[in-house]
């Protein structure tokens, strides 16, 4: 059911995405008995829709990992479990890999804003930055503003529109605004919409 929802949503994302536009998905594998490789399923869905795969980034969250003791059989080969301290950022394109812009757009409104050192750092496939507190944000699964900020700086120009079909607490919209991009966000949960609007307004003041 969850995968069917993702397929429906990302089919619409593909429809409205500009040629060469990028789709970036933050996702984690789940479970232990059995372990469910959600990233593999999502990759298949996206390729079936027609997206081109650009690569995947590992978000290393180990610096802010909790004190979980869910290691299965402790200090024994009986049934040890891996404790995931990373998530995936899957990157796709529509139609082609290059995001085109005219000479006029390059001069006037659609500009790059990423700094040289950040560009070099962001091309590496492992990103390290801390997680966001669910209690602090008021959302069960928030990601830090740093995550969409990096993707927006790396994959878009100023004035571009950033779409988040699962806007949640509004982190993507906040990052887009900070980076000089426009944004559109959706969510089926009215409480999350109110939360996102509140956070966006706070950032604007």
Question: Which residues make up each language-model segment?
Answer:
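Short, conserved SAM-binding/catalytic segment
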Residues: 197-205
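Core catalytic lobe of class I
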Residues: 1-195
């Amino acid at each position: 059911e969850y995968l069917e929802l993702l397929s429906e949503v990302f089919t619409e994302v593909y429809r409205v995405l500009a040629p060469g536009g990028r789709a970036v998905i933050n996702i984690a594998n789940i479970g232990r008995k059995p372990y469910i490789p959600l990233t593999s399923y999502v990759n298949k869905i996206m390729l079936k829709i027609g997206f081109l795969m650009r690569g995947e980034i590992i978000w290393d969250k180990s610096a802010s990992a909790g004190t979980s003791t869910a290691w299965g059989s402790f200090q024994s080969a009986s049934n040890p479990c891996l404790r995931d301290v990373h998530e995936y950022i899957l990157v796709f394109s529509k139609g082609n890999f290059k995001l085109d812009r005219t000479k006029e757009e390059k001069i006037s409104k659609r500009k790059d804003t990423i700094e040289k050192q950040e560009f070099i750092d962001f091309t590496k496939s492992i990103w390290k930055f801390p997680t966001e507190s669910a209690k602090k944000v008021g959302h069960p699964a928030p990601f830090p503003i740093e995550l969409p900020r990096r993707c927006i700086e790396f994959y878009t120009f100023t004035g571009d529109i950033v779409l988040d079909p699962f806007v949640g607490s509004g982190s993507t919209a906040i990052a887009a605004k900070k980076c000089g991009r426009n944004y559109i966000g959706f969510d089926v949960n009215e409480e999350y919409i109110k939360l996102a609007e509140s956070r966006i307004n706070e950032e604007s003041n």
